[in-house]
């Protein structure tokens, strides 16, 4: 791991996360970071799998950062994501953004990429996440994300969307929580049925240096 990713790992257990989502984004409500936290919370709630979210955030003047971070944490907790399972890189020494090389390295560790953004003109980050073997969950209401996602075999959810030529509002029946939990189960089933993604996750969680030490070497020494 690079020094930057090691710093993230000192604040959050990256290797032990069964579901690890990385979302690089401006700290603005348009990027809908709270929806990432909510879906991650729902996934953990319906499965009891250790689910963690790392936001590689960089500043934006749209909303006070402390206020928006509190909103995101509150939303995550509401849907089932413990406070310790959510991290902003701006809180650990990267107030102007996490290095791009570090984001790419985190994508190599993660297995889930969620993009509920209001609007996107071209999903470069989606391509970067896909190229590093992440399961993609994209906002179907954003035309650019739908077009790209269809080519990449992404999983779609619907969130509010707004840009030139479209402005949509979503309603969820019976509730937004039920919507996330139902889709969370389906997302996990699809992730489990992807051999390459399953192998990537198992290598990180069960065959890291730490896992080998704790589960294979230390028992031999104690025995």
Give the role of each language-model region:
Residues 135-139, 144-149, 157:
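Short hydrophobic beta-strand element within catalytic cores of glycosyltransferases
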Residues 111, 133-134:
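A short alpha->beta transition loop at the rim of the catalytic pocket in nucleotide-sugar-dependent
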Residues 118:
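Aromatic "clamp/platform" in nucleotide-sugar-dependent glycosyltransferases that forms part
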Residues 13-31, 37-40, 53-57:
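Conserved donor-binding/catalytic core segment of Leloir-type glycosyltransferases
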Residues 1-13:
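A short helix/loop element that forms part of the nucleotide-sugar donor recognition site in Leloir-type
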Residues 66-105:
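Nucleotide-activated donor-binding/catalytic signature segment of Leloir-type glycosyltransferases, i.e.
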Residues 104, 122, 127-131, 145-146:
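Short alpha-helical segment that forms part of, or immediately flanks, the ligand-binding pocket
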Residues 170-221:
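A charged, aromatic-enriched C-terminal amphipathic alpha-helix characteristic of glycosyltransferases
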